[in-house]
């Protein structure tokens, strides 16, 4: 049997993962990661509940993880990757927001922390054969597949992992649904069986987003402009606080119909909006993605490809039009609110074959220049 280090987060998914591996006869070691220090990282604005908020919620997770490890009778250790997370995840997040993009921190968090530094630690310190995580996804010989639970499938967040990382990773929940995981945890009497799923920024948690960003990026107000009429409709507090397709939070009142964010001009600090009746401004039919991660050698010969542009979106049919160096172009039927900075993940059936960061959007052959 293999020696496997499980990333035990304090949540139910990783707890059941550890149980299943031990039940299968493996030598299981639990390790809790702490990757964020609110005091050290100047994280004071944006607390979800000003009265009851604990400045370091991961401490409760650590306590839960210790109890679970005791219940499962497996050893547990704790490791900090606070500097690595700041340097290799959070700094990139801030830079992208300053550039007018909408990044997804979970992508880099998985690539650089959970499946890089954690894997290195597990191999060097514990001589692990594999690491395991509580993700709803599947691996097989370095290939990545969607999890059986379509509502919880997390393969989208894993699209930037290398084949070598995937070859050393096990996802025990890949063939299970969340309801089955909860049932197992309840039957075992695990203390976190009913614990709610984690939300918010990877390893940071829930925050009032606008306030949280102001810890690191000063507000830069500007005009809100109707993209069709060019009329100034109001003022915004900063482009970085808004994303394409957003319809609330920019303070427009007294309008005949709802308005959506459709783009921006970063240099002029302009936030472009459009009424609901003019949704064409949200549409694109092709894109260019950079930072390509090729997870299949045969993708050029595959038909019936589909793509996701955000988590929990139903995959839509696409065609790969061009590949050049580390970038690729795809086309699709007109689709709304695809957002630069987010990840596009391409599937053949349920296998992830290619992923990249959305860089440019096009409609009818023309670049959408109101996203600059």
UniProtKB/Swiss-Prot annotation:
Active-site residues per Swiss-Prot or TrEMBL entry: 109 (nucleophile), 202 (cysteine persulfide intermediate)
Region feature (Interaction with tRNA): 152-154, 310-311
Official protein name in the record: tRNA-specific 2-thiouridylase MnmA
Function: Catalyzes the 2-thiolation of uridine at the wobble position (U34) of tRNA, leading to the formation of s(2)U34.
Residues that coordinate or bind ATP: 7-14, 33, 134
A GO MF label: tRNA binding
Disulfide bonds: 109-202
Region (Interaction with target base in tRNA): 104-106
A cellular component annotation (GO) from this entry: cytoplasm
UniProt EC number: 2.8.1.13
Keyword ATP-binding attached: yes
PANTHER family in the cross-refs: MITOCHONDRIAL TRNA-SPECIFIC 2-THIOURIDYLASE 1 (PTHR11933:SF5), TRNA 5-METHYLAMINOMETHYL-2-THIOURIDYLATE -METHYLTRANSFERASE (PTHR11933)
InterPro entries on file: MnmA-like, MnmA-like_C, MnmA-like_central, MnmA-like_central_sf, Rossmann-like_a/b/a_fold
HAMAP family: tRNA_thiouridyl_MnmA
Reactions performed catalytically: S-sulfanyl-L-cysteinyl-[protein] + uridine(34) in tRNA + AH2 + ATP = 2-thiouridine(34) in tRNA + L-cysteinyl-[protein] + A + AMP + diphosphate + H(+)
Subcellular location: Cytoplasm
Entry similarity comment: Belongs to the MnmA/TRMU family.
GO biological process, one term: tRNA wobble position uridine thiolation
Gene: mnmA
Site, as annotated: Interaction with tRNA: 135, 342
SUPFAM superfamilies: Adenine nucleotide alpha hydrolases-like
UniProt keyword annotations, A-Z: ATP-binding, Cytoplasm, Disulfide bond, Nucleotide-binding, RNA-binding, Transferase, tRNA processing, tRNA-binding
């Amino acid at each position: 049997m293999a020696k496997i280090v499980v990333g035990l987060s304090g949540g139910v998914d990783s707890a059941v993962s550890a149980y299943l591996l031990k039940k299968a006869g493996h030598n299981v070691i639990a390790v809790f990661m702490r990757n964020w220090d609110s005091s050290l990282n100047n994280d004071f604005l944006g607390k979800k509940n000003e009265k009851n908020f604990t400045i370091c919620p991961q401490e409760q997770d650590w306590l839960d993880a210790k109890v679970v490890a005791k219940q499962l009778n497996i050893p547990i250790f704790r490791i900090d990757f606070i500097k690595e997370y700041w340097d290799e995840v959070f700094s990139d997040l801030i830079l992208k927001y300053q550039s007018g993009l909408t990044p997804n921190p979970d992508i880099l968090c998985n690539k650089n922390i959970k499946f890089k530094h954690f894997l290195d630690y597990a191999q060097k310190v514990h001589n692990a054969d594999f690491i395991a995580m509580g993700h709803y996804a599947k691996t097989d010989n370095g290939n990545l597949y969607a999890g059986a639970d379509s509502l919880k499938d997390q393969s989208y967040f894993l699209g930037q992992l290398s084949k070598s990382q995937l070859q050393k990773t096990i996802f025990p929940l890949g063939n299970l649904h969340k309801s089955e995981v909860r049932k197992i945890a309840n039957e075992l009497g695990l203390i976190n069986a009913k614990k709610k799923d984690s939300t918010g920024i990877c390893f940071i948690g829930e925050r009032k987003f606008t306030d949280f960003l102001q810890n690191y990026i000063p507000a830069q107000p500007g005009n809100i402009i109707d993209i069709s009429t060019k009329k100034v409709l109001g003022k915004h507090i900063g482009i970085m606080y808004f994303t394409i397709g957003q319809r609330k939070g920019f303070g427009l009142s007294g309008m005949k119909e709802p308005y959506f964010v459709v783009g921006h001009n970063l240099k002029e600090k302009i936030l472009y909006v459009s009424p609901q009746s003019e949704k064409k401004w949200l549409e694109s039919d092709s894109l260019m993605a950079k930072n390509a991660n090729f997870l299949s050698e045969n993708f050029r010969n595959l038909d019936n490809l589909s793509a996701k542009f955000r988590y929990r979106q139903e995959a839509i049919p696409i065609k790969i039009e061009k590949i050049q160096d580390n970038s690729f172009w795809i086309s699709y039927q007109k689709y709304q609110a695809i957002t630069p900075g987010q990840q596009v993940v391409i599937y053949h059936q349920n296998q992830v074959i290619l992923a990249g960061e959305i860089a440019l959007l096009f409609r009818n052959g023309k670049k959408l220049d109101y996203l600059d």
